[in-house]
Amino acid sequence: MGGAARLSAPRALVLWAVLGAAAHIGPAPDPEDWWSYKDNLQGNFVPGPPFWGLVNAAWSLCAVGKRQSPVDVELKRVLYDPFLPPLRLSTGGEKLRGTLYNTGRHVSFLPAPRPVVNVSGGPLLYSHRLSELLLLFGAHDGAGSEHQINHQGFSAEVQLIHFNQELYGNLSAASRGPNGLAILSLFVNVSQVAGNSNPFLSRLLNRDTITRISYKNDAYFLQDLSLELLFPESFGFITYQGSLSTPPCSETVTWILIDRALNITSLQMHSLRLLSQNPPSQIFQSLSGNGRPLQPLAHRALRGNRDPRHPERRCRGPNYRLHVDGAPHGR
């Protein structure tokens, strides 16, 4: 898919040098899990983003793909599509439960098999099932999201990863096929106002919960979560065709970027930055900075359900609300 990436001579020498050094340090790494956001962990070389597509043939799209993510969204390039329907969320009327997990790269929430959570509408032609929620954040406020809007980053980004359950049986199969994945992305700002925090994220980031996943592989079970509370009361969205922003960088993703940011408190953000990407037996390294650098948008189309020529207009009406379980007027 796309052929082998070609290296300049100096870059090739650097790559083979670090790979040779890595081969002499400890046991051989698992090739399917040998990647990081930083090139050096615990004194060992681990491939960072510039090397993802070079160290594993199955990840070649990370280096040579033409529809990679994340991207910088310039609002002047967004094409207004008045025919985009509203987003719909289905939970079967049940509360969400699942496991909050420190993967060593992200804060991850893995929903339990039941209830099944689906998203549809917007640019999606099929119903997509929620597989995972990821939280990415930076070491400093205003720089932690993967995507940017008009060259501006946000303190964090929440990504809801879904697979097309109508065409594929699981996330792995969907990641290899057309119309396979849908990722809803919500941006997060840090508020200096006490208590000004998104209610869903507050359930994940309160002190009693977040301290249960301080180290890599720590996990904590949560229940009675209302996923619809993650979304703003009204919002627009921007969509484009892209890729997974982690290896194997499969170009099967419909991205949907919610254009109204959420808030969390400075204390909640501080708690996130205290999470370690290592187990407790190893030196502390903050989980922050867990995003891929921006990729070229090139000639891909950006579509939105709000007219960028009139950004001052408020999002009003049912098209700018999340429709929960098919309710005609949103939540």
Curated annotation (Swiss-Prot):
Descriptive protein name: Carbonic anhydrase-related protein 11
UniProt domain Alpha-carbonic anhydrase: residue ranges: 33-306
Lineage: Eukaryota, Metazoa, Chordata, Craniata, Vertebrata
Pfam families attached to this UniProt entry: Carb_anhydrase
SMART domains reported for this sequence: Carb_anhydrase
GO cellular component: basolateral plasma membrane; extracellular region
Protein's UniProt keywords contain Glycoprotein: yes
Classification via Gene3D superfamilies: Alpha carbonic anhydrase
Alphabetized SUPFAM superfamilies for the sequence: Carbonic anhydrase
Signal sequence, start to end: 1-23
The entry's keywords: Glycoprotein, Secreted, Signal
